[in-house]
Curated annotation (Swiss-Prot):
GO terms for molecular function: adenyl-nucleotide exchange factor activity; protein homodimerization activity; protein-folding chaperone binding; unfolded protein binding. This is Protein GrpE. The gene is grpE. One of its GO terms (cellular component) is cytosol. Coiled coil: none annotated. The keyword Cytoplasm applies. Participates actively in the response to hyperosmotic and heat shock by preventing the aggregation of stress-denatured proteins, in association with DnaK and GrpE. It is the nucleotide exchange factor for DnaK and may function as a thermosensor. Unfolded proteins bind initially to DnaJ; upon interaction with the DnaJ-bound protein, DnaK hydrolyzes its bound ATP, resulting in the formation of a stable complex. GrpE releases ADP from DnaK; ATP binding to DnaK triggers the release of the substrate protein, thus completing the reaction cycle. Homodimer. Keywords: Chaperone, Cytoplasm, Stress response. Residues 1-24 have a biased composition (Basic and acidic residues).
Amino acid sequence: MSKQNKKDWKKFKDEHKEEHKVENEILEEEIDEKSQHQEPALGHPSYTALEEQLTLAEQKAHENWEKSVRALAELDNVRRRMEREVANAHKYGVEKLISALLPVVDSLEQALQLADKNSDPSMHEGLELTMKLFLDALQKFDVEQIDPLGQTFDPQQHEAMSMQPAPGAPPNSVITVFQKGYKLSDRVIRPARVIVSTK
C-alpha cells in the first residue's frame, strides 16, 4: 500500500470513527430517557415504587411496635392493679366481720363498767378474761383499739362529739372517750368518739 493510500485510509477511518462516536452517544441518551420513563421489563418494580413500599412497610412496623409497647404497658398496669387488689383483699377482707363484732366488744366494756367488783368478783373476773380474749383475737387479725384519752385530737382517728373547757388539760386534747375506736392495719374502721378540751 502506498503512502497516499495509507493517509486516505486513516482519514476515512477517523471520519467514520467520529460519526460512530456521535451515533453511540445519541443512542445511549435515547436508551437512558426510555429507561427513566418506562417500567423495567419482566414485571420488576421501579426504584421509586420499591422506595414507596419500603416507606409504607417501615411506617406499619413502627405503628405495630408502638401498639405492642402500649399493650405491654397496659398489661403491666393490670397485673399491678390485680396484685394490689389481692393484697388489699387479704389485708382488709375481714373488715365487715370486725365491724359486725365491734358492738359485742362495746357491750362487754359496758358490762365490765357496770359489774360490781366487790359484790361478785368471779363475774367481774370472767368478763375481764372474756374481754381480753376478744381483744387478743382481734389483734391476731391486725385490729388495734384506739383509746385516745389525754392525746391530742386527731380528726383522722377521732370524732369530736363536743368541746368543753377543761382546766389543767392542754387545748385540743381528748378529755373524755365515749366510745373507743378501732383500726384494721392502717385503715380506721370506726373513729373514737370523744370530748375535746378548749382553751
